[in-house]
Amino acid sequence: MKYSSVSQLGYRDLLHPWYDNAMTKPHFILASASPRRITLLSQIGISPDNVVPADIDETPLAKELPRQLGKRLSLLKAKTVATSHPDAFVLAADTVVACGRRILPKANRVEDAEQCLGMLSGRSHRVFSGIALITPKSEIFTRIVETSVTFKRLDKKDLASYLSSGEWEGKAGGYAIQGLAAGFIRQIKGSYSNVVGLPLFETTQLLQGAGFQVFK
């Protein structure tokens, strides 16, 4: 499959001819099994026709920066799924939590979550989400969104209580901002939905620029 890249969106992109001239509504596939992303998409009037998680290796490359990782993995997810669904709009996203240049893992063990939260305690960190969209015409639209999040200093009681909740399981950086961890957040600069897993403003721009109707 041959792709053409579109990285910058302008006003003219919003007037994509498919938006007005499409005879049938193409399928929309979310290349992610994340229930959070499905819920976020519903806020802008989108219910995926199908959810197809991409089976890829998410291991960071040597010296890969957080921003680069989010962009690479989101595009790889979209391309992987689009290969078997060439007539659909395929949307993928990847969220990366970083302390400085250190990429924090998805917490699969309580020890992972404890280590991540220890690093986040009392300081600011960054959350990057790469989003990638491949259209039925094999066009590629990509964005990377950054949000700064500042935690309060966590005491032993905070940490023990949160770890016992199990909310951290499978979460990048070991926390979910939309859950109990909201009580740890002193400040946020940028997109809140980006930290949840899908930046809605930028995703809307991406979809509209590609000719996919939202808010329906």
For the regions a language model picked out, list residue spans one by one:
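Short loop/helix-cap segments at secondary-structure boundaries that form the rim of catalytic
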Residues: 40-43, 61, 83-84
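N-terminal beta1-alpha1 ligand-phosphate binding loop
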Residues: 24-46
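Anionic-ligand binding patches
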Residues: 18, 24-29, 64-216
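Short glycine-rich, Thr/Ser-proximal phosphate-binding strand/loop in the N-terminal lobe
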Residues: 48-63, 140-146
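N-terminal amphipathic/hydrophobic targeting modules at extreme N-termini
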Residues: 3-15
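Short terminal hydrophobic/aromatic SLiMs and anchors at protein ends
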Residues: 3-4, 20-22
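Phosphate-coordinating loops and pocket residues in cytosolic domains that bind phosphorylated ligands
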Residues: 43, 53, 197
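Cofactor-binding loop segments of dinucleotide-utilizing enzymes, especially the Rossmann-like FAD-
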Residues: 33, 54, 136
